[in-house]
Amino acid sequence: MGNQELELDELKELDEQIRYHADLFFNKNISEISDSEYDVMVNRFNELAALYPDVAEGLETTGKLVPITLDQSELKVVKFDTPMLGLKKVYTKPEVTDFVKTIKGGVVYEYKMDGLALELQYDQGKLVSAFTRGDSLEGEDVTHAIALFKPDQIPLTVSRKDRFDVRGEGYITLSDFEYYNKVSPVPAKTMRNAVSGWVRASKSNQNPLVKGLLCFGGYWASSNFGLNTYTEVIDELRTMGFGVCPRIDVNHITNDIRAEDIPVDGVVVKADSIDEHSKLGYATKVLNWAIAYKFPGITARTKLLTAVWQVGGSGAVTPVAVYAPVNILGTDNTRATLHSLKEFKDLGLTEGCDILVVRSGDCIPHIQKAYSDTGGKLLKPPRF
């Protein structure tokens, strides 16, 4: 079987696995794998989908919003007036420098929050609705979850009477997350996953322990409020009572400075001039006037426990490394999917050996290195 055939089989198998785990998590509130492992599958699916767009177009995972089922009905899904587009990701400092050179009027730097993207809609001075980002074109109505946020983060009323929308990231601080895990009979494992689950729970199933714990980091408004710069718009949002993304400087990129109590995975660099926003516009899925610099990976050494082999419905075989629990940037990890038999062989995994696990810019854990001499016999794939 050629490489293309193997990749096509893997693409179809990933489609099957993603839909299976999405249904478990969103509709049945069951997690068989960690959010990091799910991210691995989605990232690999996107890589292969870019190589084989014609095949990917016919798969259910491509471009679909998986709604959460609540009390035998789905959350209301609403189409956005303006798509909630993403940002182009860069991983090196020279890429940031090159981008800044293309921008007129200067740039601003903000932490890239790691939480749940939300849109808040205001009319006649009142908050009327809140939606998740969804698939960027359509989002889910989570207005009932506003009570989970701290009062000084999302105002219920504002002085302006015109209709406008505010977008930002819903998140929980590390200190509040630790507090929650101390008082909750069922501790949460990951901050981002927990926030998503809490906000997207039904009104009758809201977690009372979370009420007033969540924060909001605003980073966009549909109205410029007659102002000329992004800095002025964000200052206006802060004056109106919104929490906003922390403003930082280029040194946080130069020295890879992470926030101490806020979950972040990088720095967003934006054109400050509103005219530049209009001039540069956007591409198919990303804004042209902003980029996201992703912090380099954090590594942790742990011990390999075993390797298991998953066989999907299409017959594709996927090796999975199981290792002693390790926490990186607030996320507990115990498993890493190795995307191919070649990767499994190249690592040279041995029984009980030490491995180096890295959580990289996309918050995706994988095995970077195996210390083969610290283990026993070389692990070999089974015969199928």
Question: What are the functions of these language-model segments?
Answer:
Residues Q153-V158, D162-F177, E351-H366:
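Flexible glycine-rich surface loops and low-complexity tracts that mediate binding to linear polymers
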